């Protein structure tokens, strides 16, 4: 996601729906000369269509870019998402306390090229996540006294070139 037009543009949205569903979004794009930026933050939530089916997420994204010339462009971005939700199970066999609490993020730094018929990039990236999950329990069972926890990290380099053979 980038802001391509010259100048600044800010947008905001608020929505409301059934089951107390709410959506909020604001973003700002800025492009002046060789510098560009785009920042966005969103929040969604709902009470869900039945008991124990609530959900919420807050996520943000930022992208900064610098165009050296018509051929080379440096870009960096970061994205974060924090979400919590609950699974109520089947209506005829509900599950209790099946809750998830997750934080995920990604960041990258890339150098892009565009020669017209040939374009591509080299990009360094890092993804991470922290997950806390309660597997829940069914009627007649005992609640779990532990959570599944997972922390992951993924680091790498991506390189690609595309060749356009026909106009």
Where would I find each of the regions flagged by the language model?
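Residues on the lipid-exposed face of transmembrane beta-strands in outer-membrane beta-barrel proteins
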Residues: 26-30, 62-66, 109-113, 157-163
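Short strand-turn segments of transmembrane beta-barrel domains in outer membranes
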Residues: 2-30, 41, 46-53
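Outer-membrane beta-barrel channels and translocator barrels
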Residues: 32-35, 67-71, 81, 115-118, ...
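Flexible loop and strand-edge segments within Gram-negative outer membrane beta-barrel domains
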Residues: 46-53, 57, 73-120, 126-152
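Outer-membrane beta-barrel architecture
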Residues: 7-11, 25, 34-36, 73, ...
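Short, intrinsically disordered, charge-balanced linker/junction segments flanking boundaries
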Residues: 1-4, 132, 161-167
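Membrane-embedded beta-strand positions of outer-membrane beta-barrel proteins
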Residues: 10-14, 39-41, 64, 76-78, ...
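Signature for the C-terminal beta-barrel architecture of outer-membrane proteins
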Residues: 36, 44, 62-71, 77, ...
């Amino acid at each position: 996601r980038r802001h391509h037009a010259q100048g600044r543009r800010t947008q905001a949205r608020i929505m409301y729906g059934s089951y107390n569903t709410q959506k909020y979004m604001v973003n700002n794009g800025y492009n002046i000369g060789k510098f560009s930026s785009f920042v966005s933050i969103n929040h969604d939530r709902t009470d869900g269509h039945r008991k124990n089916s609530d959900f919420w997420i807050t996520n943000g994204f930022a992208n900064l870019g610098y165009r050296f010339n018509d051929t080379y462009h440096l870009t960096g971005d970061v994205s974060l998402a924090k979400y919590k939700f609950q699974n109520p199970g089947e209506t005829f066999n509900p599950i209790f306390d099946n809750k998830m609490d997750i934080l995920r993020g990604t960041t990258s730094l890339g150098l892009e090229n565009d020669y017209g018929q040939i374009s591509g990039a080299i990009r360094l990236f890092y993804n991470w996540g922290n997950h806390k999950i309660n597997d829940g329990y069914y009627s007649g069972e005992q609640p779990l006294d532990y959570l599944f926890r997972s922390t992951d990290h993924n680091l790498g380099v991506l390189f690609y070139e595309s060749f356009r053979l026909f106009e």
